[in-house]
């Protein structure tokens, strides 16, 4: 009987030791898993913030490009409208063409402004 008791006692100690090792291993694995999950979560959060910032910046750039195009288009339409209105009043005889011609200094300023608008439209 003593042999059995001693054998079972040794086996019991082995099982208890294995359980302790298993418990320790599971605890360590859980801690490492938690670290890994937290790391992934942190990196994902950083990447999401970076992505949102990047998208916001690109959206701002596109909005600026669109607004510049709209302003340029509106200026072109306004200039064409004025030109056509001048043509109509001259054709109908309401005003003489000479009366519509701006003084030479105003004409130079207008040409310079149109050149600047053309340059800004190219950017």
From Swiss-Prot:
Expressing tissues: Highly expressed in brain, particularly in the substantia nigra. Also expressed in the corpus callosum, heart, skeletal muscle, ovary, testis, colon and spleen. Weak expression in pancreas, kidney and lung. Expressed predominantly in the cell bodies and axons of primary sensory neurons, sympathetic neurons and motoneurons.
GO CC aspect terms: axon; centrosome; cytoplasm; cytosol; Golgi apparatus; neuronal cell body; perinuclear region of cytoplasm; spindle
Keywords, ordered alphabetically: Cytoplasm, Cytoskeleton, Phosphoprotein, Repeat
Quaternary context: May be a centrosome-associated protein. Interacts with MYOC; affects its secretion and its aggregation.
Coiled coil (residue ranges): none
Family of this protein: Belongs to the synuclein family.
The keyword Lipid metabolism belongs to this UniProt entry's keyword annotation: no
Organism whose genome encodes this protein: Mus musculus (Mouse)
Basic and acidic residues biased stretches: 107-123
PTM comment: Phosphorylated. Phosphorylation by GRK5 appears to occur on residues distinct from the residue phosphorylated by other kinases.
Pfam families: Synuclein (PF01387)
Phosphoserine PTM sites in chain numbering: 67, 72, 120
Lineage per the UniProt record: Eukaryota, Metazoa, Chordata, Craniata, Vertebrata
Gene3D superfamilies found in the cross-reference section: Helix hairpin bin
InterPro entries recorded: Synuclein (IPR001058), Synuclein_gamma (IPR002462)
Name the record gives this protein: Gamma-synuclein
Known role: Plays a role in neurofilament network integrity. May be involved in modulating axonal architecture during development and in the adult. In vitro, increases the susceptibility of neurofilament-H to calcium-dependent proteases. May also function in modulating the keratin network in skin. Activates the MAPK and Elk-1 signal transduction pathway.
Chain positions covered by the region annotation Disordered: 91-123
UniProt subcellular location: Cytoplasm, Perinuclear region; Cytoplasm, Cytoskeleton, Microtubule organizing center, Centrosome; Cytoplasm, Cytoskeleton, Spindle
Alphabetical GO biological process terms: adult locomotory behavior; chemical synaptic transmission; protein secretion; regulation of dopamine secretion; regulation of neurotransmitter secretion; synapse organization
Renumbered residue ranges of the record's region 4 X 11 AA tandem repeats of [EGSA]-K-T-K-[EQ]-[GQ]-V-X(4): 20-67
């Amino acid at each position: 009987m003593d042999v059995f008791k001693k054998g079972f006692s040794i086996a019991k100690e082995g099982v208890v030791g294995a359980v302790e090792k298993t418990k320790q291993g599971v605890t360590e694995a859980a801690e490492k898993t938690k670290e890994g999950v937290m790391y992934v979560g942190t990196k994902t959060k950083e990447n999401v913030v970076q992505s949102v910032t990047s998208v916001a910046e690109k959206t701002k750039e596109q909005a600026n490009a669109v607004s510049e195009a709209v302003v340029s288009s509106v200026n072109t339409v306004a200039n064409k409208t004025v030109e056509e209105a001048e043509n109509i009043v001259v054709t109908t005889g309401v005003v003489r063409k000479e009366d519509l011609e701006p003084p030479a200094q105003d004409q130079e300023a207008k040409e310079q402004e149109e050149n600047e608008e053309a340059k800004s439209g190219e950017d």
